Amino acid sequence: MARTILAFDFGTYSIGCAVGQDITGTAQGLPSFKAQDGIPNWDQIEKVIKEWQPERLVVGLPLNMDGSEQPLTQRAKKFANRLNGRFNLPVELQDERLTTVSAKAEIFERGGYKALKKDKVDSISACLILESWFEAQ
């Protein structure tokens, strides 16, 4: 039976979101959430969780290229803990190194420079995070 998973690309001003099913291993971008200094609109996130009814959540873990933590790493972990506390769903962290670079390259290939909108980048980054999580399972 297919399990629905939601993934988040945490950022201080925008949080990308994607949904996917483990049976296909593919993800689809959802609209990004605006955040104020890393604090999302929890009502919007709750709405998406109610709509998709995921069995688990995946949060991208921002790391430096050498694997060490960066200032955003702890904030992403805190966001993951809050998701777990608010929605009582299992939350896993997934290494997200290079997802933003890959997302920008993918968008640029499709639509050129004008297509590089922040919310699109965040949603595609969330897709890449989720697809890499599926591959690691």
Curated annotation (Swiss-Prot):
Its EC number is 3.1.-.-. Keywords: Cytoplasm, Hydrolase, Nuclease, Ribosome biogenesis. One of its GO terms (biological process) is rRNA 5'-end processing. Pfam families: RuvX. GO terms for molecular function: nuclease activity. It is found in: Cytoplasm. One of its GO terms (cellular component) is cytosol. InterPro entries: RNaseH-like_sf (IPR012337), YqgF (IPR005227), YqgF/RNaseH-like_dom (IPR006641), YqgF/RNaseH-like_dom_sf (IPR037027). Belongs to the YqgF nuclease family. Could be a nuclease involved in processing of the 5'-end of pre-16S rRNA. NCBIfam families: RNAse_H_YqgF. This is Putative pre-16S rRNA nuclease. It comes from Actinobacillus pleuropneumoniae serotype 5b (strain L20).
